[in-house]
Amino acid sequence: MKGGTSKFKTHTETLYKKKKWSSVSEKRPQKCPSQCLESKQPQVSVLGKRRRASQTPAQETLESEWPQKAKRKKRRREPQTPAQETLESEWPQKAKKKKRRGEPQTPTQESLESEQPPVSLLGKRRRESQTPAQENSESEQPRKAKRRRKKRKGSQQPTSSLLKTPETFLKAKKTTSAHKKKKNSVLEVDMETGIILVDKENMENLLETSRKDVDIVYVDMSKGQRSAKVRETGELPAAKPQEHGCRELLGDVRSRKKQKHLQKVAPWDVVQGSQPESISLPPSEPLSSEDLEGKSTEAAVFCKKKSKKNVFRSQELEPIPDSLDDSETISERLDSTHHGGAVGAGEECESTKESHSIKKKSKKKKHKSVALATSSDSASVTDSKAKNALVDSSEGSGAVREEDVDHRPAEAEAQACSTEKHREAMQRLEPTHEEESNSESASNSAARHISEDRRESDDSDVDLGSAVRQLREFIPDIQERAATTIRRMYRDDLGRFKEFKAQGVAIRFGKFSAKENKQIEKNVQDFLSLTGIESADKLLYTDRYPEEKTLITNLKRKHAFRLHIGKGIARPWKLVYYRAKKIFDVNNYKGRYNEEDTKKLKAYHSLHGNDWKKIGAMVARSSLSVALKFSQIGGTRNQGAWSKAETQRLIKAVEDVILKKMSPQELRELDSKLQEDPEGRLSIVREKLYKGISWVEVEARVETRNWMQCKSKWTEILTKRMTHGGFVYRGVNALQAKITLIERLYELNVNDANEIDWEDLASAIGDVPPPFVQAKFYKLKAACVPFWQKKTFPEIIDYLYKNSLPLLKEKLDKKMKKKDGQIQTPAAPKQDFLFKDIFHCDDDSDEGSPEEPSASDVQ
């Protein structure tokens, strides 16, 4: 019974083999002549001859003995794969265990051959190399297992398994026959190392049953399934029409490309429409003819004795050819390396050369257009940007991911050879059209960037003296500013300043008014609607959105953000920009600091120093807010009354800072005065005693007080010494000063506190500095006006005039009747003072300020 079964199987396989040879001979025109293939791959052809010589003649004698059973065998179409037969002959017990576990069986080689003609050649060679001893082992399998496999055939995923051990090859070499020779062998299998192709379902069981000297390759058969489905539906064209279609397609693409060059538009939809709709394959990168030759040699080298890890490592480490496009990934390179074993047709080489020449022409035209738009330096930048844009487009169009790459040997890739030819021919043309459109957009953007760069580089060519002379008309102290600031204002603000002068508007500095704040908000909203940027935070704090930073920056340059942000505001645009950042900063409105926030701020400052931007992001506040708060709480700062030593250090620090800030011309004037009158003393202009003082430097010199404490204490000392110890804000004089202040503010009829001339207002009270008057007005409105934070400046002044002013006058009349006191007449303000009158240290320096109003004065 066993002998009959073995004869039946041998006869069936031989009969099916003859039928396949006849079908393959009809499709033979699809491949290259055997001489061409043997000349390109000499090592593969020699190995093929050795394998064909190992076929046994015993199989031919059994062809005419079991004709009926052969027909049943065809209906079943269940021949065992070489891997299964070898496993069952060598490890019968383990093979039975696998069947009991219900491991999904692999599809037969005959069904794969019917769907994929290139793989059928390999299947025939494997079946012919089997000995009768291996076939006898198949008769021992029960028929129930075969029926079970027949039922499960429809639900199984197509996989191919192959196991060739050194023992099997030794047996095959002993029984050789030289009368059957095949000259068209393209792909060969490693004769020394066994390879198993498995999928994820039977991977675990094969790891248990496989030997140590067998390499296992994990295969993604999704590509095989797609090609098989296309073959069954009959939508894929035949080999000859496909070859002819590729040539026609290349000709159509050339003609369309010429038309699109005239229109300066290169859409991919036209080329995609000419492609057969049945082909839906992932895009592949263009390869030159040199790459195809290199990959054919790699397929021959792959047949040597190497482990799978070493093969992949060598492929990853080898340098990428220059002819490959930059957007080709490592996973696509591995996939194309396996395809290289099946590439060798003359038609494909011709189409590759033609498409490569088209790509070279497009690159030449691209370089010419870039060279006309920009200089030689900018051309390289444009090329890199165009390549980056091309990489993005290729990745977005569906590049092959690394986990989806089919890491199978060259012989398994032959099943999709014809499909890959058409796909590569089409996809080589796609980057050509994309490069044209990308080069145009890149050249335009590069021209804009270069114009901006040239505009910035022109700052160094600006004559500093000429810029100072022209800007001095609008900013008298422009020469005191840094050279870079002067050049920037000359470039960005001089034209705006001239327009405001023609309108009769003076250039402003200092605190922004409410009207200016509203104009800034309007300008920002208009620019957002113009550019389509989502929020003001993205516009003004672009660094917080690194993914959109380049796009937002380009939009700001394109639509002249500097002009839009400063529209209608007579200030330098940089100051307007800083004010807008403060207004629209979402972290700038967090309320007061609590104890926990203060502790965090100190801890972060100990770690990061004065990196206020980083610290502000960590505590969710603006950089200005954390810097200002730390200046108040940082270090060991004293509270309460000032000591005599602290007051003396403060006076000395202010004097040093003022002298340090003086210009050389002013110092020369002081020196000339000393030479004329050696016994005299140096004088100082009034404004220099309270304007332009760096309170941060003063704080560093005092060491025990923060800058706000230093500024407040200096205002008190300066007021006392400018009035020679007079009490301008005590008793009835304080009440009269408040009444005068409210009346003068009501007469000014201004809409914002920034519009007030505090110098003129201070003269109405006496010879006092403007900061003193500002401090008194703040205390007055805070004490008398309820909810003053929510009121506008005109509303505050109206409330003081209607409600507080009558009460203050009534109180002043009562005090005048009781004490019969006299009100001092305000002294005229001096324009300069002697240094000895201001910067002297006496015994009463440590006393508290006598100018502080009492509780009764505030009421």
Curated annotation (Swiss-Prot):
Polar residues composition bias: residue spans: 32-44
Example GO molecular function: chromatin binding
Keywords: DNA replication inhibitor, DNA-binding, Isopeptide bond, Nucleus, Phosphoprotein, Repeat, Transcription, Transcription regulation, Transcription termination, Ubl conjugation
Sequence ranges assigned to domain Myb-like in this UniProt record: 585-634, 634-718
Main location: nucleus
A GO biological-process term: termination of RNA polymerase I transcription
Region listing for May be involved in localization to the nucleolus and interaction with ARF, in residue ranges: 121-210
Basic and acidic residues compositional bias, start-end: 400-411, 419-436
Residue ranges of the region described as N-terminal region (NRD): 1-210
Region described as May be involved in interaction with ARF: 471-859
Quaternary context: Oligomer. The oligomeric structure enables to interact simultaneously with two separate DNA fragments. Interacts with BAZ2A/TIP5. Interacts with CAVIN1. Interacts (via the N-terminal region (NRD) and a C-terminal region) with CDKN2A/ARF; the interaction is direct. Interacts (via C-terminal region) with NPM1/B23.
Domain notes per entry: The N-terminal region (NRD) inhibits DNA-binding via its interaction with the C-terminal region.
Protein name: Transcription termination factor 1
Taxonomic lineage: Eukaryota, Metazoa, Chordata, Craniata, Vertebrata
Encoding gene per record: Ttf1
